[in-house]
């Protein structure tokens, strides 16, 4: 499981996917999120701007990202 360490209080979902290298651009992030391919804490998330906080887990195409403070 990859970890992203927060610099601020939160990171937005689209930014987290890009930071982890799971998508190449914001446009790609928007597409995969709106198509329901991304899970946050086990539930499908459709908002690219969803704020992720310490302890949240993002799942996408078999990869998981843990958000850490």
How would you name each of these model-derived features?
Residues 9-51:
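A basic, amphipathic helix-loop patch mediating RNA/tRNA/ribosome contacts
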Residues 1-11:
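A detector for short, charged/polar N-terminal pre-domain segments
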Residues 23-25, 58-61:
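Short, low-complexity, polar/charged sequence segments that are solvent-exposed and flexible
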Residues 62-67:
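Short, charged beta-turn/beta-strand-edge "cap" motif at the junction between a beta-strand
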